[in-house]
């Protein structure tokens, strides 16, 4: 069954509120799409139907309560302005986004399931302001941080596969003293990679902490 079912349940249990669901629809016949439908072509009988999956789900949650828009300065708000012409032209206003997927480089293809920068770009622009921090708990090759950096946001990412460190460094063009320009804002960019010896245990540790929190919540 769809993993998003578990995701919604877990996020609600830990206190987040469900807000939206967006469908990312990939072009029909795209190379990264599974060809499950071919089974019926070989066996044209009932019970051999497996449709090709051409979409993925983006689920949006928020903290309880309303966002305090008054806390955002006029300057930050203006610098984070969304291009409404692009918003309309590319149909961001729909709950289904048609965006072509991308293939990871051959070097890293066995490690990651690539997604287009445009997908991250829309989400970062729609749900954060310049200067805020974007968190990606499944960093992969660093796409989220690359896009966030380009859009003037800070970014923190977690990745348990140490083999991807080289790819992350390569994509972020590590240079702690480089002076970059973000949407007309000059700032000192600092990129740091921290390696934890217990990284591979974090998944189990987090699950245990969540289960402990849920048991405590239910007992009360």
Regions from the language model: what does each represent?
Residues 169-215:
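S-adenosyl-L-methionine
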Residues 1-167, 211-220:
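Core catalytic lobe of class I
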């Amino acid at each position: 069954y769809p993993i998003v079912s578990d995701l919604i349940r877990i996020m609600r249990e830990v206190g987040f509120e469900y807000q939206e669901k967006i469908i990312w629809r990939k072009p029909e016949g795209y190379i990264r799409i599974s060809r499950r439908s071919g089974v019926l072509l070989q066996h044209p009988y009932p019970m051999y139907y497996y449709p090709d999956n051409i979409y993925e789900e983006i689920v949006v949650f928020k903290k309880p309560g309303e966002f305090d828009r008054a806390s955002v300065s006029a300057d930050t708000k203006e610098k984070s302005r969304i291009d409404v012409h692009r918003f309309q032209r590319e149909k961001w206003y729909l709950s289904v986004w048609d965006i072509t997927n991308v293939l990871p480089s051959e070097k890293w293809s066995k490690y990651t399931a690539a997604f287009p920068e445009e997908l991250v770009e829309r989400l970062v622009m729609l749900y954060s302001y310049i200067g805020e921090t974007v968190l990606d708990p499944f960093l992969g090759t660093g796409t989220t941080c690359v896009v966030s950096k380009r859009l003037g946001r800070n970014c923190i990412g977690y990745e348990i596969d140490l083999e991807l460190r080289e790819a992350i460094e390569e994509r972020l063009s590590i240079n702690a003293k480089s002076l970059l320009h973000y949407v007309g804002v000059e700032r000192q960019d600092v990129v740091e990679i921290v390696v934890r010896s217990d990284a591979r245990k974090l998944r189990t540790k987090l699950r245990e902490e969540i289960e402990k929190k849920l048991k405590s919540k239910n007992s009360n």
